[in-house]
Amino acid sequence: MAIVAGVDFGTLSVRVSLVDSDKGRLGTASAAYPLHRRREDPDFATQSHADQMAALVQATRAVLAETAVDPAAIVALALDTTGSSVIPVDSQLQPLDDYMLWCDHRAHREAQQITQLAHQEDLEAIAWCGGVYSHEWGFAKLLYWLRHNPDKRGRFATALEHCDMVAATLIGITDPAEVPRSICAMGHKWMWNTRWDGLPPQWFLSKLDPLFDGIRARLGGRYLASDAIAGHLNDHWAGQLGL
């Protein structure tokens, strides 16, 4: 018998299900967190990383109590989150802002500029994301954030997709170079592909905006497929989650 905790971060709540390899799903619990919107700006949608992690603790402890499962029997966490939710962090992987959620659509101009330059330069990557770069995706959101937060640029180290930020937090990673990055999340959303050695070339990113100088290196890490182990739960979060 092996039990896995399936963790699913949605737009308004996180759900934790305990699944037994023999018996199937044993139980599920969820916990909500706030979604920040602005009446004067319908494109604005953000969420706090701290709020999400607090909800994860609440949901995990609730499902453990509901099922009376021995925490020692849980062998793994399988993590799923919303895609296209991006967070900028400092050199210690501490958030510089809230997540720009998938439904945050402020980066229209940046997405149009990426699409235009990609076609102008015959960038192969644009064909792999339908020929149009979306305002929901990573480079557009990050460029918007850098343009609108000049006071935070000096502390900016890298940006992470939602799933990678949660994984790094649970593992206890504080070095951006050690972050496990999901190939699924970084694929068309950040135009990552082994065909062109990962991310788009630095010359393209710098031509898009000098604020992206050096950004390719900043988006380094361990790029992994979804069947890989991102890491191991650290003692702090094992204690917080009751595992």
Where do the model's predicted regions map?
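Carbohydrate-associated surface elements
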Residues: 104
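Hydrophobic packing residues within well-ordered alpha-helices of enzyme cores
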Residues: 111-114, 145
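N-terminal glycine/serine-rich phosphate-binding loop of ATP-dependent small-molecule kinases
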Residues: 1-98, 109, 214-217, 222, ...
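Active-site catalytic pocket residues across diverse enzymes, especially alpha/beta-hydrolases
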Residues: 67, 118, 149
